[in-house]
């Protein structure tokens, strides 16, 4: 099948922002102008096309990232809508993995807010080229220039305006295109009619100042242009665009545009910039991975290369069942064909292929290199798996997901729904790698764990709506962990020899604290323990580590070296070695100076100045460490690290202390040792 658009005319972009910066409205407008929707959906009326789960429409926030295809000026644009609420940063992480470029949306009044910083850092991690769109130019307190300065100060971004606004707040009329040196004024409400005019006389000087700053920033990226500029020659629009595109793709410059999506101003110009400056799949480096022998390998964006695709999100659709949102990096994926899930080493059949327009879908015969779509009919594939051709397998770099920090006990309102709830929770955990569910061995309760209170509220909500399971939910608990502080050597010996067949397993391990994940190293020499019993020892240790010895919390950040052991020709079995492994682990834990770790949250509280003292005192009383303070838009911002256990119910307390004027955001930062007195309290509560 011939391509409708050549690869250089593809743009796979994400729209990322702080909650409420107007990201979904912006996406809506893009869909409207690119002809995908005939009626504009307003978020505050609860009808936005991208927000397709009922909870999103009620809360006016975006939770799942839907991939939508639209067309603009002979380009195919795939938009991945990412949530801005901090409990859903995992959605942002996974969408950034499959994007080539991103538009960061900022609120002209708030500028760079805490979540914008988080999302920006995530984009840095994946080297995603970005442009910025400063939205809400029509609201009270909008300040374009302050927002640009905040991008420079707080994000260390080389932010360069390529447009400046004409007027602001109620008088926001349009913008000045600094590259073409002309004014664009909107003459109707839908923003479909606009006039290109001369720059208003009272703005000529300002436009000149910003235009020369922009040209200086751009020529710095290109030696040839620099020489031309220094010799006083005129630099053409084409030259500016070419140099700017190169700079954006190399992550050296961030062009800044402005507008008001709600008032339909500036969106088309922002789309022009997406097409003009953000990379196509050909502009980014080949995707990296490993072949079946573990050697480094890569795939270029080319239809003739072997197939390599990444399933970046699993969603359950009420009509077609499981949808796997996938990006094809190389080769062609055909409906009805077989592929290899190289992460799991299993064959999968591609049922149907669909391109999504938020929640209508269009069936296609194939997805080519650089395209995004969803696969219907995969059985085994989960988030982060690689799909590749059977005769040329590759495993693309895996995605990393943080561990949950908060958990609650949950039970169905009727005994009859117990099984239904179990199935539903398993489905939800398959969709969302940061959501975990397990049964507490001591109490028999079902526990759900996630990234924050909102995250779990939405899970419970979905259980009721999508799976029709009514639940009772306990009080949120902190997901504590246990770890060790010193290296030790210990053994576990399991011997049972009382008539009939006995049991014999014996393992000697060295256990050391580490910063990273659990590691197991087999250092047995001379066959002291036969090969087939090594894995059972590892399994025994891993199972035992799920329930630590201080207060039964999972043990993390340690590594094990199996150094010795012994076996019995007749009595040894896998089971016996598994038990020996878990005994060795427990013996090692008691000697290794174990401690409890608690999640520490990065908290930002924004309050009017008069409440500053009171709020700082309150943060300190919650065992908080204040990291810094700054003034922002007439309010004081306090930045601190506070243990999660002290933050439950903080929203209510902050509201009452500040008469509803204070706001805060928090997100998980790291785990830290619990002070002795608190540790004793935790142990007491568990007993």
UniProtKB/Swiss-Prot annotation:
Gene: fusA
Role this protein plays: Catalyzes the GTP-dependent ribosomal translocation step during translation elongation. During this step, the ribosome changes from the pre-translocational (PRE) to the post-translocational (POST) state as the newly formed A-site-bound peptidyl-tRNA and P-site-bound deacylated tRNA move to the P and E sites, respectively. Catalyzes the coordinated movement of the two tRNA molecules, the mRNA and conformational changes in the ribosome.
Keyword Transcription regulation: no
GO molecular function, one term: translation elongation factor activity
Entry binding sites for GTP: 17-24, 81-85, 135-138
InterPro entries attached to this UniProt entry: EF-G-like_DII, EFG_II, EFG_III, EFG_III/V, EFG_IV, EFG_V, EFG_V-like, G_TR_CS
Major subcellular site: cytoplasm
Keyword Transmembrane applies: no
Name of the protein this chain belongs to: Elongation factor G
Gene3D superfamilies noted in UniProt: 3.30.230.10, 3.30.70.240, Elongation Factor G (Translational Gtpase), domain 3, P-loop containing nucleotide triphosphate hydrolases, Translation factors
Origin species: Clostridium acetobutylicum (strain ATCC 824 / DSM 792 / JCM 1419 / IAM 19013 / LMG 5710 / NBRC 13948 / NRRL B-527 / VKM B-1787 / 2291 / W)
Domain tr-type G: 8-282
Pfam entry (one): EFG_IV
GO annotation, cellular component aspect: cytoplasm
Compartments reported by the entry: Cytoplasm
GO biological process terms, semicolon-separated: ribosome disassembly
Domain of life: Bacteria
């Amino acid at each position: 099948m011939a391509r409708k658009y050549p690869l250089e005319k593809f743009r796979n972009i994400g729209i990322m922002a702080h909650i409420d910066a107007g990201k979904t409205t912006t996406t809506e407008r893009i869909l409207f102008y690119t002809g995908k929707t005939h009626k504009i959906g307003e978020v505050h009326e609860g009808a936005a096309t991208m927000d397709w789960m009922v909870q999103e429409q009620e809360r006016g926030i975006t939770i799942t990232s839907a991939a939508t295809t639209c067309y603009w000026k002979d380009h195919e644009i795939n938009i991945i809508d990412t949530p801005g609420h901090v409990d859903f940063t995992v959605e942002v992480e996974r969408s950034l993995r499959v994007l080539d470029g991103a538009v960061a949306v900022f609120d002209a009044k708030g500028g760079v807010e805490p979540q914008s910083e988080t999302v920006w850092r995530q984009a840095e991690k994946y080297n995603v080229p970005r442009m910025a769109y400063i939205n809400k130019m029509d609201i009270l307190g909008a300040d374009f220039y302050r927002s640009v300065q905040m991008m420079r100060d707080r994000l260390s971004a080389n932010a360069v305006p390529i447009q400046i606004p004409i007027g602001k707040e109620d008088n926001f009329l349009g913008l000045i295109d600094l590259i073409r040196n002309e004014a664009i004024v909107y003459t109707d409400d839908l923003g479909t009619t606009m006039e290109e005019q001369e720059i208003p006389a009272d703005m000529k000087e300002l436009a000149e100042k910003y235009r020369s700053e922009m040209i200086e920033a751009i020529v710095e990226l290109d030696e040839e242009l620099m020489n031309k500029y220094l010799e006083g020659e005129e630099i053409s629009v084409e030259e500016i665009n070419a140099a700017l595109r190169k700079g954006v793709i190399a992550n050296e410059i961030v062009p800044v545009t402005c507008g008001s999506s709600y008032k339909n101003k500036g969106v088309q110009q922002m789309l022009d910039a997406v097409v003009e400056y953000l990379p196509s799949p050909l502009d980014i480096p080949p995707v990296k991975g490993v072949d079946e022998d573990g050697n480094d390998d890569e795939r270029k964006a080319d239809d003739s290369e072997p197939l390599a695709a990444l399933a970046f999100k699993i969603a359950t659709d009420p009509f077609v069942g499981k949808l796997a949102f996938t990006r094809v990096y190389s080769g062609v994926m055909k409906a009805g064909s077989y592929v290899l899930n190289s992460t799991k080493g299993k064959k999968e059949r591609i049922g149907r292929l669909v391109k999504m327009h938020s929640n209508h879908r269009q069936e296609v015969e194939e997805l080519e290199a650089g395209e995004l779509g969803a696969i219907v009919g995969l059985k085994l594939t989960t988030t982060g798996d690689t799909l590749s051709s059977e005769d040329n397998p590759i495993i693309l770099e895996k995605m990393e997901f943080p561990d949950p920090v908060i958990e609650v006990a949950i039970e169905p309102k009727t005994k009859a729904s117990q099984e239904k709830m179990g199935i539903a929770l398993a489905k939800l955990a398959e969709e969302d790698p940061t959501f975990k569910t397990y049964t507490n061995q001591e109490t028999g309760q079902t526990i759900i764990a996630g990234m924050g209170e909102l995250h779990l509220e939405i899970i419970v909500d979905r259980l009721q709506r999508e799976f029709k399971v009514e639940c009772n939910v306990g009080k949120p608990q902190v997901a504590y962990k246990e770890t060790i502080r010193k290296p030790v050597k210990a053994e576990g010996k399991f011997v049972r020899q009382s008539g009939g067949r006995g049991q014999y397993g014996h393992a000697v391990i060295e256990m050391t604290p580490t910063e990273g994940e659990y590691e197991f190293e087999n250092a047995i020499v001379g066959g002291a323990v036969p090969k087939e019993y090594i894995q059972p020892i590892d399994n025994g240790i891993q199972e035992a580590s799920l329930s630590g010895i201080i207060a039964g919390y999972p043990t993390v950040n340690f590594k094990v070296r199996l150094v010795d052991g012994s076996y019995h020709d007749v009595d040894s079995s896998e089971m016996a070695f598994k038990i020996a492994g878990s005994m060795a682990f427990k013996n090692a834990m008691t000697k290794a100076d174990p401690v409890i770790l608690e999640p520490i949250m990065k908290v930002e509280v924004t309050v009017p100045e008069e409440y500053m003292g009171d709020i700082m005192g309150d943060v300190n009383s919650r065992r908080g460490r204040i990291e810094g303070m700054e003034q922002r838009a007439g309010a004081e911002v306090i930045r601190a690290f506070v243990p999660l256990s002290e933050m439950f119910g903080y929203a209510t307390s902050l509201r009452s202390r500040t008469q509803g004027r204070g706001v805060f955001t928090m997100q998980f930062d790291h785990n830290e040792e619990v002070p002795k007195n608190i540790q004793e309290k935790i142990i007491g509560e568990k007993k």
